[in-house]
Amino acid sequence: MRKYIKIGVAGPVGAGKTALIERLTREIASKYSVAVITNDIYTQEDAEFLTKNSLLPPERIMGVETGGCPHTAIREDASMNLEAVDEMVARFPEVELIFIESGGDNLSATFSPDLADVTIFVIDVAQGEKIPRKGGPGITRSDLLVINKTDLAPFVGADLSVMERDARRMRNGQPFIFTNLMKNENLDGVIGWIEKYALLKNIEDPASLVR
């Protein structure tokens, strides 16, 4: 009986996907058995960053070089990633959480249901306050939307209240959360969401979660 949960993490280049996984693994690796699979088109840069900066040992981090369009490797033809999952489970039969990070993509990125049990989509304030209302499957269909880099709002003229209003409208009751991962702000809310909705712990919704 399979006992691990696969969490897909997608979003545009530079939004904070790798930073989110790095900080999550730092906080939860002592509590859960965790592994990470990253996707890059031609390099293993994200895997190398996590190996250098994460608390996870190198053998719990695997890089997949997709060699093409990043969303193909997580949706239309997820075979390379599914093989990586199988290899990781063979290495660590006790694994409980496997984070699968997509390559940087646009707002239409979605994971094959065979590859991810739940999905997190990361955008950032620096892209402008209009990003939530642009929609796209990443915004509207992900299980959790993370709006990162709230500290940059004053510098790019973004109104967080407008972003919250638009995210509420586009998400239609699905949760989202504002973060500043550089300072771990609301990281506990993301962890709480994972524990409640991915690991199915009997806990309250995190206070920082918005619907």
Swiss-Prot record:
It is found in: Cytoplasm. Gene3D superfamilies: P-loop containing nucleotide triphosphate hydrolases. Its main location: cytoplasm. SUPFAM superfamilies: P-loop containing nucleoside triphosphate hydrolases (SSF52540). CDD domains: UreG. GTP binds at G11, P12, V13, G14, A15, G16, K17, T18. GO terms for biological process: urea catabolic process. One of its GO terms (molecular function) is GTP binding. InterPro entries: CobW/HypB/UreG_nucleotide-bd (IPR003495), P-loop_NTPase (IPR027417), UreG (IPR004400). It comes from the Bacteria. Pfam families: cobW (PF02492). One of its GO terms (cellular component) is cytoplasm. Belongs to the SIMIBI class G3E GTPase family. UreG subfamily. Homodimer. UreD, UreF and UreG form a complex that acts as a GTP-hydrolysis-dependent molecular chaperone, activating the urease apoprotein by helping to assemble the nickel containing metallocenter of UreC. The UreE protein probably delivers the nickel. Facilitates the functional incorporation of the urease nickel metallocenter. This process requires GTP hydrolysis, probably effectuated by UreG. NCBIfam families: ureG. This is Urease accessory protein UreG. It comes from Actinobacillus pleuropneumoniae serotype 5b (strain L20). The gene is ureG.
